[in-house]
C-alpha cells in the first residue's frame, strides 16, 4: 500500500490560481478541501469523489475540523463498487468514533448487499444476510422465522408465492422479532416491511434491457429497512420492533404468473394482475397484512416500487407517502437531522380507488386514466394496512441506487434512508 495522501480542511478559499470556484487544492503536503459554510458536507462528499477519480486509494484525514459527519461525508463520496480503498481516520472522541464505526459497518453492508449480483444474492441469501446482520448487533434479543416455497402458499402468502413461483429459487418471507424487553407479551412498537425482489425481469410484462440492467437492486427496500433496524439497535433502541422481508425473483418460466391472474389475499382482497412488472406491491401486501396484525404504533414499508417516483424526484430524494401528517412530519424531521433527502408526494383517498378491475376488487396497476403511478401504488398498498390513515409510512426508494456515477456518488447503491428510519425509531 502506498503512503497515505493527507486530506485537510480549511475555511479559507483556495489560491486564486486554482480558479474562483475551486473546492480543493493540491500542495506538497497533500490535498486541502476549502469549506465555504454553505454546504460543507456536500462539498466534502463531492471532493472525495474527485479524489477517488484521481486514482488515490489511500488517504489520511488529517488536521483540525474533522468530526463523524464530515468523515462520513468523505466516505460516502470516496467509496466505490470496484477496488479497495483505505482511510486513516482522524482522532475522534469515543462517541463520535463509535457512531462512525457503526455507519461504516451497517450502511456499507446495505450498499454492498444492494450492489451484489443477483446470481449470488437470491431470496434465501438475502433473508439470511439480514438475519446475520441483525444478530450481530442484537445477539439473543432476536428471534426469527423463515418461510419459503410451497409453505408460503399453504400459509396464505399468495402475493409472495405468486410472484416468486416462476423462479427456481424459492420465494422467502423473513419475519424477525427484535425484543429487547425480555417480555414475550411486550407490545410491538413498530413494524418494518421491505420489498426484497432479488431480480426483476418484469415477468411477462418484460422490461427492456435499459430498464432491466439495474434490477439486481430491486431489493433495495429490504436492505434499507434491515440496515435501519440494525443501526437503531446500535443507537440504543429499547422497544420491540418486527421486520418483515418479502423476498423473491420475478422471472419468466412455464410456472410464472400471468396477466389476468387473480390473487386472493388473507384479508379477503382480490387483485387482478394486469402488469407482472408491478410485482413489488403484490409481495409487500403480504408483509403489510402481517405487520397490521401486530397492532404496532407505526408501520414503515420501503420499496424500490415505481419509476414514477424517480420521474418526479430523480435519484436524489426518497419519496414519502402517508395519510398521517404528524408521522410524516416526524420522519421528515428525522431526515433533516440526518442530512438525508426525503420529499413527500401526494397520497389521498381518491388514489385508493384509481385501480379499477372488471374481475376483482383491485387492479395491480392504475389505468391510463390515472397516471399518478407512485401515488396509486401507495394507494394500492393502503388496502393491506388495517389502519392506513394513522401510523403508516410508505417510502418509495428512488434514491437507493444510481446506474451511473455523479459528482457526489459512485455508481451503485447509496445507503440513503437507513439513518433517517433509525432516527425515527429511536426518537
Curated annotation (Swiss-Prot):
Cofactor(s) the protein needs: Mn(2+)
Gene Ontology BP terms: proteolysis
Cofactor binding remark: Binds 2 manganese ions per subunit.
Subcellular location: Cytoplasm
Molecular function (Gene Ontology), one example: manganese ion binding
EC assignment: 3.4.11.23
Family: Belongs to the peptidase M17 family.
Role: Probably plays an important role in intracellular peptide degradation.
Entry annotated with the keyword Hydrolase: yes
Primary localization: cytoplasm
CDD domains for this protein: Peptidase_M17 (cd00433)
Protein name, entry field: Peptidase B
UniProt binding sites for Mn(2+) 2: 195, 200, 218, 279
Record: active site: 207, 281
Matches recorded under SUPFAM superfamilies: Zn-dependent exopeptidases
Entry annotated with the keyword rRNA-binding: no
Keywords: Aminopeptidase, Cytoplasm, Hydrolase, Manganese, Metal-binding, Protease
Residues annotated for Mn(2+) 1 binding in this entry: 200, 277, 279
InterPro entries listed in its UniProt record: Leucine_aapep/pepB, M17_PepB-like_N, Pept_M17_PepB, Peptidase_M17_C
Enzymatic reactions: Release of an N-terminal amino acid, Xaa, from a peptide or arylamide. Xaa is preferably Glu or Asp but may be other amino acids, including Leu, Met, His, Cys and Gln
Assigned GO CC terms: cytoplasm
A Pfam short name: DUF3663
Superkingdom in the source lineage: Bacteria
NCBIfam families, sorted: PRK05015.1
Subunit structure: Homohexamer.
Gene designation per UniProt: pepB
